[in-house]
């Protein structure tokens, strides 16, 4: 089929390349001329394992990019994959979505055939039906069900494994209002269903599909926070939390996924999505106490880590290496990274900070241009008084003699990845 994707960030670029891999002809529409040029040159604008190969393979063939909305006219369906950042009260900012919906509607006004518009961005329930659909209707002169269909297809992509997550999904959620919309969605995803071995396809309503995404992320975020809360309790009793969590993960009712206790969750999804659904629930008069508790536990983990360091010395004037700047391994994304909170607190306390990450250094440099950055973990550790491990990159598990170059050889491990060794003042966060 002929597909168009509005937005070429982490989600937009990934789904565009993956749809091309499935045999669809895809045009990526974006207002950023540099990103458009990069995609057309076969260069992925983001770091994501496997994505660069797909973009290079299909650019100029089944995958192209443009700033011109008119190219949407030759496509059968448009996916909206635009950012929905958090506002000060936690609710989502729909500015980019509204602008794109209006521009899309103005374009579709010149199309005679029916067109399907699919919300891919994470939005709270009723957004597609009450905000996006009416905006497209107003600008296009069309009506939903008469020349225009709307749908919701939430993404469940994890940064660092997004390509694999798309091509090997646990489930595919299709939210729509009309039979024609369901039929078009089914045709779009038919190659994926066949390739992935017939994963469950959930056919549901639009608002239900929107809520499924939030419920999914809220559950996972809460599971991590519960693991951290249990691990914090283990620590005060001198109990090995890793053994406890590994054991309960063997229970089929619980499972081992997302039981890795440590510094907590960050990134572009969990913080934003938990804040958004909490704000949306409060706007409807409901206080989501359990979900708020999960956020509170998560927010407290970096401070607990800093307390372990403060127990050893006054931070003022000390050189502290922060190992890992990305919010998780496998990505260069620093959004809501735990390292940001650690670095800011260290600077506020008068510490001298050196950061290291195998891929995210340049992104963090934009946030903290005045701290030092090392080209390797070994360089970061040299002459440091302490090290804080913030991201569980595999290379940190292999560190050994590199610690000998530290002055005081204090290591506080937020991810339980460093191997204990003689001569280290080592403590894990949990």
From Swiss-Prot:
Keyword annotations of the record: NAD, Oxidoreductase
Active site per database record: 269
Regulation of protein activity: Activity improves as salinity decreases.
Reactions performed catalytically: UDP-alpha-D-glucose + 2 NAD(+) + H2O = UDP-alpha-D-glucuronate + 2 NADH + 3 H(+)
GO molecular function annotation: NAD binding; UDP-glucose 6-dehydrogenase activity
Annotated pathway: Nucleotide-sugar biosynthesis; UDP-alpha-D-glucuronate biosynthesis; UDP-alpha-D-glucuronate from UDP-alpha-D-glucose: step 1/1; Cell surface structure biogenesis; S-layer biogenesis
GO terms, biological process: polysaccharide biosynthetic process; S-layer organization; UDP-glucuronate biosynthetic process
Knockout-associated phenotype: Mutants exhibit defective or limited motility.
Gene3D superfamilies: Cytochrome c1, transmembrane anchor, C-terminal, NAD(P)-binding Rossmann-like Domain
NCBIfam families, sorted: NDP-sugDHase, UDPGDh_AglM
Family: Belongs to the UDP-glucose/GDP-mannose dehydrogenase family.
Function: Involved in the assembly of a N-linked pentasaccharide that decorates the S-layer glycoprotein and flagellins. Involved in the biosynthesis of the hexuronic acids found at both positions 2 and 3 of the pentasaccharide.
Protein name from the UniProt record: UDP-glucose 6-dehydrogenase AglM
Lineage, top ranks: Archaea, Methanobacteriati, Methanobacteriota, Stenosarchaea group, Halobacteria
Designated gene of the protein: aglM
